[in-house]
C-alpha cells in the first residue's frame, strides 16, 4: 500500500516538474528568438572597417561576433521586442562592435593591452556609447582576454564548430568555468538554428539571474564553482528532457524566472 502511495506521489511530482519545464521552455524559446533576431543586426556591420578578416574562416568570425554580442549582455540593456528599423534600440549597439574590434586586434597582435585599448575606443566613441558602456568592465576585459588566447577548432564537416571542443579550449584558457567563456557557446548555437545539436557535455552559462531562477524552483542557490556548474547542467538537461526542448530554452527560461530582462 505504501509502495503504491509513493509511486503516486512520484508521478505527481514528475507531472508537476514536466509542467514547470514546459513553461520554462516556452518562455525561453521566445526570449531566444529575440536574441537570435538581435544577432542578425551584425549583418549591417561593415567588417572591413573593423579589422582584416578576409583570411579568417567565416565560422570563426561568426563565433567571435557571438563573443562580442554576449559580452554586450553585461550592459544589462533589455533587448528590443519590436522591429523598428529607424529606432536606435533596434540597431546594433556600438559597444559590441568595439568589443569585436578589440578582440580581433588582440588576436592579431595589434594591441597588447586589452583594457587600455577598450577604454580608448569607448572614449573615442563617447557620444555613441553614452549610457551604453559596460557596467562590468573587468568581466568584459576578462572575457576578451580569454577568447584572444583561445585557438578555435577547425570547422567540421557539417560547416559548424564543435561546441564541446570549443568549450574545452575556452575553459583551459580561463582556468575554470566562467560565464564569459560559456555564454558565447549559447549565442553561437542559437544563431545556428533549432536543428543545431548541442552536446550534453556543454555547460549552460549561469549568471545571477539564472542562479536566482534555480533557487526559486529548487530552493538552493548556485555559484560559479565547477561543481555548481555541473549540478546546473544536470538540472538543465533533466528539464530539457521533460519538455523535449534544448538546454538553451531552459537556460533562458530560468533567466527570465530569475528576473532577467
Tell what function each PLM region has.
Residues 1-261:
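HhH-family (HhH-GPD) DNA N-glycosylase catalytic core used in base-excision repair
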Amino acid at each position: 500500500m505504501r509502495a503504491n502511495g509513493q509511486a503516486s506521489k512520484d508521478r505527481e511530482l514528475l507531472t508537476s516538474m514536466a509542467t514547470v519545464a514546459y513553461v520554462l521552455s516556452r518562455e525561453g524559446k521566445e526570449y531566444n528568438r529575440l536574441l537570435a533576431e538581435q544577432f542578425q543586426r551584425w549583418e549591417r556591420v561593415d567588417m572591413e572597417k573593423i579589422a582584416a578578416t578576409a583570411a579568417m574562416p567565416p565560422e570563426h568570425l561568426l563565433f567571435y561576433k557571438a563573443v562580442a554580442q554576449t559580452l554586450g549582455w553585461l550592459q544589462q540593456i533589455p533587448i528590443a521586442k519590436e522591429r523598428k528599423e529607424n529606432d536606435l534600440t533596434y540597431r546594433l549597439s556600438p559597444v559590441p562592435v568595439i568589443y569585436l574590434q578589440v578582440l580581433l586586434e588582440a588576436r592579431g597582435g595589434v594591441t597588447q593591452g586589452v583594457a587600455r585599448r577598450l577604454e580608448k575606443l569607448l572614449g573615442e566613441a563617447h557620444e555613441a556609447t553614452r549610457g551604453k558602456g559596460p557596467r562590468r568592465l573587468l568581466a568584459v576585459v576578462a572575457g576578451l582576454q580569454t577568447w584572444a588566447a583561445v585557438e578555435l577548432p577547425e570547422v567540421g564537416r557539417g560547416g559548424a564548430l564543435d561546441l564541446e571542443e570549443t568549450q574545452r579550449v575556452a575553459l583551459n584558457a580561463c582556468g575554470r568555468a566562467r560565464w564569459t567563456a560559456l555564454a558565447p557557446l549559447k549565442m553561437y548555437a542559437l544563431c545556428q538554428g533549432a536543428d543545431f545539436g548541442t552536446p550534453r557535455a556543454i555547460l549552460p552559462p549561469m549568471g545571477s539571474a539564472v542562479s536566482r531562477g534555480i533557487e526559486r524552483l529548487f530552493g538552493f542557490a548556485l555559484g560559479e564553482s565547477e561543481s555548481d556548474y555541473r549540478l546546473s547542467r544536470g538540472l538543465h538537461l533533466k528539464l530539457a528532457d521533460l519538455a523535449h526542448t534544448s538546454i538553451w530554452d531552459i537556460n533562458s527560461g530560468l533567466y527570465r524566472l530569475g528576473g532577467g530582462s
